[in-house]
Amino acid sequence: MRKFISILIIVSTLLSYQICRAQSSPKYIEVEWQNGSEAAKRIMISKFYYDPLDSWSPFGNDVGSDTYYLYCDWKREHSNQNVKGFLEEELINFGYPGFDLYIDGNDPEKLKGIVDTMVNKYIDLNAINNIVISLAFSQLFLDGRIEREIKKWAEAAFSRELMYLDFWDSEKGEMEKRQKRMNQLLSDLRKG
């Protein structure tokens, strides 16, 4: 009987330990400088990266923040799959399957033609761009590197955003601030 009670105590202790450990284990790595990869700590040094209220941060706008957490979930479940599958899935969920992620601002008429077919025009394009840019910086933050194709897509996203920079000119100086931030993000992206 003593042996049975001892075994029962040991098993219940181990079980309690596993339950406590599982509850204290975070599902997501919070976007804070100290939690980033070594490369992210070197490259993503500006405070805006870690400000959840900064709408021009890759993780501060709603779409960018959602992309980070959705990518964390996807990565956990699809660790051996190409990240293009994640991005295609997000574009389908957003209502733009097959959007050409390589299209940039070098052909303004073609891009404007595509944007004109979108339900919410530039707002939808901006959301697509935010998904791509957030994914690139999510990879840098979590993995310490940005896949070559993701980097190309993000560079194209910045190029598309530059075409619509005047959208952000509602307040004096806002457009210039946005352009300065985009230049910094693009520079940091290229270091990743």
At which residue positions do the language-model features occur?
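Alpha-helical repeat scaffolds
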Residues: 150-159
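Amphipathic alpha-helical elements of HEAT/ARM-like alpha-solenoid repeat scaffolds that form extended
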Residues: 126-143
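Charged, low-complexity interaction regions
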Residues: 80-81, 143-147
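Bacterial Sec-dependent N-terminal signal peptides
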Residues: 1-23
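Eukaryote-biased recognition of C-terminal alpha-helical segments
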Residues: 158-192
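Acidic, Ser/Thr- and Gly/Pro-rich intrinsically disordered linkers and low-complexity segments
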Residues: 91-123
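Amphipathic, membrane-active segments
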Residues: 73-100
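N-terminal leader/targeting peptides and immediately adjacent processing regions
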Residues: 21-74
